[in-house]
């Protein structure tokens, strides 16, 4: 059994029911909208976000779930899908997970309106059912994701950023959404357990941090499926291995690195030289150590809960983040 199927196994029935509920939450009286949302639903990824919601909900409650849990997972998916549709417009991207993006097929104007529609559907799903605590969790996440993107744009102009700024960017851009999924799962079944909700939010944040550092490492190795090496350097993205080396090498080497990324980022030979330089100066070892620290912090939180199929699945999920090839 594939690792993702193993993770999904304890919540297989819930995931099947969620699919039906999620489809109906997208429905509209406008035929064009239905056609586009049908296209979106049929090209979904691994569905890690709702899996986090359900597994956490069941782990903290001893196997219980409620309609609130399904609504929470739907709200996360609706609002996150809205942000992805808008992202593709902003990035002028024609592909999403190997398929044509909404803006590629229906142009930017329709893509922006579809994103707005999905956002409003997510908001109304919470408001109509009085799930204001769940709505607050995802709203904070969307705010932080926007701030993280803008912080990255602001700092990208200066390539010599410090490690603390890098962590804040990836916390907001990547980790905050996984943190919201985990907090949402806990809050949907035990809304009064504020300490436990915060604990699960932190658990998700640690996984998200490890996930992004793993993504950074893919840029320097041939391990990744579907991500060519050096792509982050070509796009002038600051990754942890590069930041570490920039902060530990000599001033002359630092200037060469910054110059390479700023002016020669499209030169294949120079990009290869940068990759080798980062490897030789222990950038990958340092990033791997940091990634494993976040992994361990997440596992330490899981250790506080009694053994259950849901805890085991979440442990698998944490380790999958580190061991994945894509």
Predicted regions located by residue number:
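All-alpha prenyltransferase/terpene-synthase fold signal
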Residues: 1-326
């Amino acid at each position: 059994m594939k690792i993702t199927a193993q993770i999904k196994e304890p919540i297989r029935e819930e995931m099947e029911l969620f699919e039906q509920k999620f489809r109906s939450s997208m429905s509209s009286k406008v035929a064009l909208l239905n056609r586009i949302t049908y296209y979106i639903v049929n090209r979904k990824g691994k569905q890690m976000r709702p899996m986090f919601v359900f597994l956490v909900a069941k782990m903290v409650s001893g196997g219980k779930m409620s309609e609130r849990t399904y609504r929470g997972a739907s709200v996360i998916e609706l609002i996150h899908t809205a942000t992805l549709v808008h992202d593709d417009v902003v990035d002028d991207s024609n592909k999403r997970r190997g398929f044509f993006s909404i803006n590629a097929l229906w142009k930017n104007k329709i893509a922006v309106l579809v994103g707005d529609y999905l956002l409003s559907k997510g908001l109304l799903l919470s408001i109509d059912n009085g799930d204001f605590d769940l709505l607050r969790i995802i709203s904070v996440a969307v705010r932080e994701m926007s701030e993280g993107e803008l912080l990255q744009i602001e700092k990208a102009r200066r390539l010599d950023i410090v490690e603390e700024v890098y962590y804040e960017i990836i916390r907001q851009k990547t980790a905050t959404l996984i943190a919201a999924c985990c907090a949402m799962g806990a809050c949907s079944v035990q809304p009064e357990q504020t300490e436990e909700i915060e604990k699960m939010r932190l658990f998700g944040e640690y996984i998200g941090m490890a996930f992004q550092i793993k993504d950074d490492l893919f840029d320097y190795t041939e391990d990744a499926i579907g991500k060519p090496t050096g792509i982050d350097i070509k796009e002038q993205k600051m990754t942890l291995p590069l930041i570490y080396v920039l902060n530990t090498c000599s001033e002359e080497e630092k200037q060469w690195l910054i110059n390479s990324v700023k002016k020669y980022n499209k030169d294949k030979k120079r990009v290869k030289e940068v990759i080798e330089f980062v490897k030789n100066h222990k950038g990958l070892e340092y990033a791997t150590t940091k990634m494993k620290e976040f992994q361990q912090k997440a596992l330490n939180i899981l250790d506080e809960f009694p053994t259950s199929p849901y805890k085991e699945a979440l442990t698998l999920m944490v380790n999958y983040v580190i061991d994945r090839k894509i």
